[in-house]
């Protein structure tokens, strides 16, 4: 964390809990003991950061609980966002829990896609000078002209379909 005594903002380094990028965040001095919302510019993850806990964890990484006098900044209407004067590691871990979107599963390729892929490889193996576009066009025509292969009924001996 950068030390700036008379500045109106404090530069803080906050790790994104989704993509693990370290973000340089300018926090107004009046919000240094509040919970602030941070958006990652890399993954656009949005989460709340307890600034007092973040500041304290940077200065004392192995603390269990600390009596910490929280100075009053702002009006009494914002006092509901102030943190208690006793902070524990449990509070910090609760702040870092994030709802991550489900991982995208790799789907099994369709019979058509699998056939086209294999057919293009076969066509290019037989004729290396053919363009990918021509090989794709030929593979699509082969798919249309050989309906028995759509259902996986193609025998190994018939696997070498003729180029249309």
Swiss-Prot record:
Domain of life where this protein originates: Eukaryota
Zinc finger map (C4-type): 16-43
A Pfam family this chain is assigned to: YABBY_N
Example of a GO MF term: DNA-binding transcription factor activity
A GO BP annotation: regulation of leaf development
Key words of the record: DNA-binding, Metal-binding, Nucleus, Zinc, Zinc-finger
Transmembrane region(s): none
Record's GO cellular component terms: nucleus
Database matches in Gene3D superfamilies: High mobility group box domain
Phenotypic effect of disruption: Leaves polarity and growth defects.
Localisation per UniProt entry: Nucleus
Recorded family membership: Belongs to the YABBY family.
Assembly information from the UniProt record: Binds to LUG and LUH; these complexes promote adaxial cell identity in leaves as well as embryonic shoot apical meristem (SAM) initiation and postembryonic SAM maintenance. Interacts with SPL/NZZ and SPEAR2.
Entry function: Promotes adaxial cell identity. Regulates the initiation of embryonic shoot apical meristem (SAM) development.
The protein's name: Axial regulator YABBY 5
Organism of provenance: Arabidopsis thaliana (Mouse-ear cress)
